[in-house]
Curated annotation (Swiss-Prot):
This is Flagellar P-ring protein 2. GO terms for biological process: bacterial-type flagellum-dependent cell motility. Keywords: Bacterial flagellum, Periplasm, Signal. It comes from Chromobacterium violaceum (strain ATCC 12472 / DSM 30191 / JCM 1249 / CCUG 213 / NBRC 12614 / NCIMB 9131 / NCTC 9757 / MK). The basal body constitutes a major portion of the flagellar organelle and consists of four rings (L,P,S, and M) mounted on a central rod. It is found in: Periplasm; Bacterial flagellum basal body. GO terms for cellular component: bacterial-type flagellum basal body, distal rod, P ring; outer membrane-bounded periplasmic space. Assembles around the rod to form the L-ring and probably protects the motor/basal body from shearing forces during rotation.
Amino acid sequence: MKKWIVMASLLLAALPAMSAQRLKDIANIGGVRPNQLIGYGLVVGLDGSGDKVTSSPFTGQAMINMLNQLGVQVPPGTKIDPKNVAAVTLTATLPPFSKRGQMLDVTASSIGDAKSLRGGTLLLSPLKGADGQIYAMAQGNVVVGGAGASAGGSSTQINQLSVGRIPSGATVEREVQTALGDGEFIHLELQESDFTTANRAVQAINKVFGGDTARAVDGRLIEVRAPFDSNQRVQFLSRMENIAVDPADLSPLVIINARTGSIVMNQAVTLGSCAVSHGNLSVTVNNTPQVSQPNPLSGGKTVVTNQADITINSTSGKVVGLKGGANLSQVVNALNALGATPQDLISILQAMKSAGSLKADLQII
């Protein structure tokens, strides 16, 4: 834990202070955004690693429907064993301004009990948007980055085998209209809501284009007057998105991942003076089988019982005084002095926040 905190502090300490950034790096143009697509399909050509008919009956039904659509009549009541076929969900991202014929990458994820999608081919499948309309058609060979093997009841696996990617596997068939060329104004949406940054962005835009070209609606939204002609509007946006803006100073923030024990903090975090007592309590349970063997002629039965031994170990807590830290390196040194595990450190940081010693917002994900 100490090693990783020290490495993080060195990396963050090497970063320069908050400097000017391009407007395109801190704000998005309203209405210019990607759209998520989703679909359902069948991956065929698997070498016996597909779905099982007993646990994934929908795969067999999908195969029958597909064959019927292709003109192959399947007699009613026919059971199909889809061991070489896997049912998958398809996901893709439709970028803004996508045109018909543009290719998209597709991710295929097994929804049955297929062991692997390696070597499979996705059959032609529609990709729909949130409105239920078809925006792309997907088909192609599935590329799986993992590997696995099994023999004699033992198996090993590297990375995921039930998720694959189809590079350039979908073709855009429907375009999404944007409101970029409509109206007198366009809207800039800051990625992080902040009144200071919004005010500085407005001043920087008006300094370049003059007059009242831009005005702040709130801490996130900026309204900008733009030319009506599409070509002039593109030139205008090209100039505007490269304007340098000084963002507001970062708010002190500590982010904790409770599942992995990861802790990340920014350079604005400081500590107030406090004292922390830290100790550990561990409980160990050992089960030992005990066999009761009766005499041969007694008519009794052999009985196996478990004897449980429970041991509780407690390490004495120590009180560590933490001095107030004015920069990230001092905060890291103070936390390293505790000698706590990542999970213990989460509880300590929460207690320090409640005591008012941690001068930062605490966000647990």
